Amino acid sequence: MKRISLTQHLIEQQRLHNKIPSELRLLIEVVGRACKSISHAVGKGALGEVLGSAGSENVQGEVQKKLDVISNEILLEANEWGGHLAAMASEEMETIHRIPNRYPKGEYLLMFDPLDGSSNIDVNVSIGTIFSVLKAPEGMTEPTEQDFMQPGTRQVAAGYAVYGPQTVLVLTTGDGVHCFTLDREMGAWVLTQKDIKIPEDTKEFAINASNQRHWFPPVKRYVDEMLAGSTGVRGKDFNMRWIASMVADVHRILNRGGIFMYPADAREPNKPGKLRLMYEANPMAFIVEQAGGAATDGTRRILDIQPEKLHQRVAVFLGSKNEVDLVTSYHQQ
């Protein structure tokens, strides 16, 4: 198989679809380089003294791991100076990060979850980085949080990296989903999967079943029907998989089908969900839809949601289309 690098792939996609201008290509390449650096830091583990808590909390009130902080800094520093961005926003930061005046400004906005699944860091389970790219509004001079308040349909690129047995980068620019594997010897992203498609039907689901007693009736009904197996109304047996790392769970679903669920529940009935719309749900929904799947919050298509605040949370149901459609229909009854 001919080896195609990330750069070559992006250039060829631009020639085919005319959707990846040079500034966007360069931005994606910079994010890719930052993910290589994060992969290197993750790979050192205890030898690099990067495990354990940083002794601080992020804007969500969550205790930060050392690698959360390191990964956030890597992404900020890598993307500040290139001239492709007007501003960045991170799950780990309270407000947006404007590009310093000493650097040229670009026309894109970058959002990221620098290290998703960080509760798994110390036990050596796959974790990852999620990112989303928006076009800055026309006529914008000094970026504000309001400039980021764009629905997911406005994303021009989205992707994630998984730091597991192999380090992979999954990317969409609106023309399918492609996967690159990091060649550690060459230090290069190499195209290893083109036009990934999620099977419409599945026998696997991912949900944190320890919260079952808190679920609302539509989720309870849906999961109970799957657990009833071949003797129940679904007429087939299902397996449950739960890694507690969204990138790892979604990557499995992308490759062999399944449904990922992180619903709202009765513990905080006034909160619409746990996952962040801008940093997690939107980029993953873009990727999943581009792979032929579906993504909703139980009632609405995630990509249609109009954000109201930077750290807005949503419920998430995504993956194989027929399963997402079914659980969504239960919420709408």
From Swiss-Prot:
PANTHER family: FRUCTOSE-1,6-BISPHOSPHATASE-RELATED (PTHR11556), SEDOHEPTULOSE-1,7-BISPHOSPHATASE, CHLOROPLASTIC (PTHR11556:SF35)
Binding sites annotated in the UniProt record for substrate: 116-119, 208, 274
Organism lineage: Bacteria, Pseudomonadati, Pseudomonadota, Betaproteobacteria, Burkholderiales
Reactions catalysed according to its record: beta-D-fructose 1,6-bisphosphate + H2O = beta-D-fructose 6-phosphate + phosphate
Gene Ontology terms, MF aspect: fructose 1,6-bisphosphate 1-phosphatase activity; magnesium ion binding
Species, as recorded: Herbaspirillum seropedicae
Keyword check for Metal-binding: yes
Protein location: Cytoplasm
The keyword Magnesium is assigned to this record: yes
UniProt-annotated binding residues for Mg(2+) 1: 91, 113, 115
GO cellular component, one term: cytosol
Swiss-Prot/TrEMBL cofactor(s): Mg(2+)
Protein name: Fructose-1,6-bisphosphatase class 1
Keywords: Carbohydrate metabolism, Cytoplasm, Hydrolase, Magnesium, Metal-binding
Complex and partners: Homotetramer.
Primary localisation category: cytoplasm
Domain of life: Bacteria
Record-linked InterPro entries: FBPase_C_dom (IPR044015), FBPase_class-1 (IPR000146), FBPase_N (IPR033391), FBPtase (IPR028343)
EC number per UniProt: 3.1.3.11
Residues that, per the record, bind Mg(2+) 2: 113, 116, 280
Pathway: Carbohydrate biosynthesis; gluconeogenesis
Family from the record: Belongs to the FBPase class 1 family.
